[in-house]
UniProtKB/Swiss-Prot annotation:
Disulfide bonds join 31-125, 184-215, 194-209. It comes from Cellvibrio japonicus (strain Ueda107). It holds the Pfam family Glyco_hydro_10. Pathway: Glycan degradation; xylan degradation. Residues 27-128 form the CBM2 domain. Residues 1-26 form the signal peptide. The keyword S-adenosyl-L-methionine does not apply. It catalyses: Endohydrolysis of (1->4)-beta-D-xylosidic linkages in xylans. The lineage of its organism: Bacteria, Pseudomonadati, Pseudomonadota, Gammaproteobacteria, Cellvibrionales. This is Endo-1,4-beta-xylanase A. Residues 183-212 form the CBM10 domain.
Amino acid sequence: MRTAMAKSLGAAAFLGAALFAHTLAAQTATCSYNITNEWNTGYTGDITITNRGSSAINGWSVNWQYATNRLSSSWNANVSGSNPYSASNLSWNGNIQPGQSVSFGFQVNKNGGSAERPSVGGSICSGSVASSSAPASSVPSSIASSSPSSVASSVISSMASSSPVSSSSVASSTPGSSSGNQQCNWYGTLYPLCVTTTNGWGWEDQRSCIARSTCAAQPAPFGIVGSGSSTPVSSSSSSLSSSSVVSSIRSSSSSSSSSVATGNGLASLADFPIGVAVAASGGNADIFTSSARQNIVRAEFNQITAENIMKMSYMYSGSNFSFTNSDRLVSWAAQNGQTVHGHALVWHPSYQLPNWASDSNANFRQDFARHIDTVAAHFAGQVKSWDVVNEALFDSADDPDGRGSANGYRQSVFYRQFGGPEYIDEAFRRARAADPTAELYYNDFNTEENGAKTTALVNLVQRLLNNGVPIDGVGFQMHVMNDYPSIANIRQAMQKIVALSPTLKIKITELDVRLNNPYDGNSSNDYTNRNDCAVSCAGLDRQKARYKEIVQAYLEVVPPGRRGGITVWGIADPDSWLYTHQNLPDWPLLFNDNLQPKPAYQGVVEALSGR
């Protein structure tokens, strides 16, 4: 079973382990190898290196060799060679504390043979766990059962699996760090201290770190450890309750954010996930490089959704799986008190499709199954919930090929290859088999209008329920305007889904509220200049009321045990896909261009607080 720390490092491992000679003294590790998903021509697998010694391992390398199989891709390691192969750690996963693990993954071409399981070599591996394999469409039980189901349990699990750290292990800090031999004992788990970041969490040397001031602000016995500090890592930290840990993390994170006046955070006002979509593909809004946005996420939210990098095409490099970018984001989430809502396993736009998803592919169904099996299994235990299928219903406003409706369904490449909507059933069944613990959602837009598309949604969900398909919830994207649709229709649309099953969850997945309505035929109402609502305008006041009434409707219509959460589709206005829409500026989110909370933010606070 993998430790919580292994997951936070972004796991899925490789084959064969040997560590650099200068770190070998008094260090032992077990190296376990698994085939996680196998198909006719290849497979994906992983190996995990677990430090069983008493001192930290600081830097590792691995090597292995096949008979006929050949490596086609890998992630979370630097790989070289063409059989034999060698791999070494990246900058962020080279340090393995006692009792902790790191791992990286691979995809292999069988080259006409069977799946090989080469010997695990290397002097660091004192014990090699026998190789195991998972047949096609299955997932290792160690992956499926080892994951915490909430932020709190993730933190507790991480603390429970961390051994008390000796001075020798503390001394092995990252090379190049001006922190010397010091690290941060963050509620029972060791993290690097930041060099340049002065508040909160940072991203330096390709990994997360904690600012000295934030680390030192924790209550005893936590804080800075190592040379110059006598604060130990106490094994008793595992006895902390989940509520006290989450409360402490929120308190510390909130105090580091200069852009949020309340200091409490939206997530502290709800007993269900309050999430936000984050960009992770470069630019000013990139969560990895914008410390101000990181502060907002830590202070306000407890769940993130990737805007793009967990969509279908982003899981590949050419025809091979590649999880490096998505693993980095999932790791960041785990290290920053966030769960992850995966978006999305299946989505139709041509610009978001992998190479295999075409009408001409004779092996389409096999590749479809391999995609669901591999991606869902890879993130098993790390992703709390998935949009399994996104936007499978027809919408006249989004029909670029002019194919029209097929009994309410979009005639996507998936629909065409399967000859109907059964691909939806298949996707849910395979996702459940690959990750039994994740919540599985169907997600779509304009379904809150309570019109024909809402009826199509009801029919789709009812069909899935009748067929025993393992659907856990329905996502309403909720891209709305200040004046459309009516709150009465939003309520009725959600109520129709609530009525379908006593266990079905409802999640608002992509909430934003436009001030301008380009469809109302009255341009005199439009705000046309970027400065019109930069600070204040009547539209911002209406937007506050709109956010408030939507959250209130959600709380009143959806029973407490069936609230999957509310996610806002972006952190600040300039991050939004609607910042300029149909030649009009807009201000659709909770924070403005200066990353300050808007009236809309207060509207959400009031709704969650019952005011």
